[in-house]
Amino acid sequence: MAEVRDFLFEIGSEEMPSAPLQKAIAQFNKLVVSGLKDSGLSFGEVKILSTPRRLNAYVKDVAEATEEISEVKRGPKAEIAFDAEGNPTKAAEGFARKCGVNADALTRRVDTDGHEYVFAELNIPSVPATKILSELATSWIAALDWPRSQRWGSFHERYVRPVRWLCVLFGSEIVPVTYADVTSSNTTQGHRVLGPGYHEVATPADYEQVLKNAGVLLQEQRKDVILAGIKEVEAARPGSHVDMPEKVFEEVINLTEWPQVLVGTFDEEFLNVPSEIITESMLSNQRYFPIYDAEGKLTREFIVVSNADPSCAERVIDGNERVVRARLDDAKFFFEEDLKHTLDEFAQRLETVVFQEKLGTVLQKTQRMEALAAEIALDETSNKEEAELAARAAHLAKADLVSQAVVEFTSQQGVMGGYYAEAAGEKSDVAAAIREHYRPRFAGDELPSGQIGRFVAIADKLDTICGIFAINEPPTGSSDPYAVRRAAIGVIALVRSTANLDLKKLIASSLELYRQQGLVVDESVQSQVEQYFIGRLASIAKDEKISADAIEAVSAIGVINPDEFLQRAHAVTLSVKYSERYKHLPNLSVLYFLRESTLISATLLNTWANLFKRRKRFRRTVSFSSMTSTLSKKMSIGSRS
């Protein structure tokens, strides 16, 4: 058994951007693990460590050398490998080349099957780990794939930021590595302010402590320090809550080497600005964490995670307060300027905004949404007042896209429209619908809180889906530029929250609205859109552990109303399960199951009873899916039964 040592490979550079660094950590881990496996070196745990100025691989228990390997490989039959004069043929030369030996080194002998073959005897010597690690380390730096990399000086090598040092140790031995004229050593660099300059690392085991003494903490330590600081802030303000989106929090961890949690404030006047654009400005631009009070209202305070000398905390707070004041001044100006215009004015400006080159402007989209949202409201509620509210909300839903606030803070589309609608005196249902009509933005997201919002959301998403299919640009497995897949999942979730909507009818209505605006829509598009929804429903059914045969059977009959599709599929799966379990009492067992199911109507009980009385009539050659498809057609399930 070869002796083992720990291996340390640190790439030191100028400060790296946080988001690319986060992705590089996972990428670096794969490179290190695959490289060591391919090299033949045995190794233990691999840890990837990072700070804004370093990316590091720490590998436990790396063997000091590869094992010596003796191996015999069998090649082609001798009669094929050599000609009549005993000269090697192309077959022999190819086999020898593959094995890394000369054809003259091949031997001939009879194998266990009685035939004579050629053999290559391979003796692969042991290779020192230092040599292998030196080659691997150089290749790993070059192999890291950054969204944007750069060259510096007169060097051709690339990295996300200029490389300044390399600390590469195998035990106490320095592994020779050179990249962009930087040569490896046993030194690292500390914090720019708290521990500037080079610091010697005797062995990999000393690395963490050397960094700590030089004012640098590794990821988990930094995370713990930041969380502890935030808990102290919350404890000092009973009932308060610090908003820490995971993505921003991970970025902040990778922006500091010696984090310190500080609290800043902004002027009271900015609390009159919608809290969403205040928090977006702080989180997206400055990576500050807003603080909310016990009632969930935004306060004037925010958290800054500093990487500076702790003795300079007051100056750091003052500097960050000046930065946030400037940003919030802009947000306040945009909001107040927008309030000088009505949403109807903004809505007319949508004529200049392209929705999709072949599908016209956003104004045309809102006109289609108005008609479709009103139809959806009437289908669901039979209430003309609800239909008028839905049409009004759809008319104004996209108006804020041309507002100054949304141009600056794009993720607040809809939200700002809701504020402007309230300020203009629109009904609360309309304002809420405008604010929430983009929901659900992803699988599992909240639905709009009110009916009007759901009607507008369905109209918006269905209009996009039908339009993209109408111009023959449907999503593919690798491309979905218009987020059709996400829109379809949203429509399914929204329709499931209603009682009376017919998705097939709504698809037809949406396509007809495009025709009325002059778009030529092929008759086959209706079927294409329906099949797309069936595909999404099949995926949902699969996630709900419904059998593949049942999904196939229900898909075959063209059901696209979500609840009906899923309930039919569940019923087919469970009924077949019960009929298999109680073959000797088919009618009673299935009827017992059906009686216990809250999803299935009395009509279905009778249908299944009749079918199972005649089950002997089914030929054995009939496939399961064709049989269940037939049965599924006869079902009357769910709220429409």
Which residue ranges define each predicted feature?
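Amphipathic alpha-helical "coupling" segments that flank catalytic cores
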Residues: 1-641
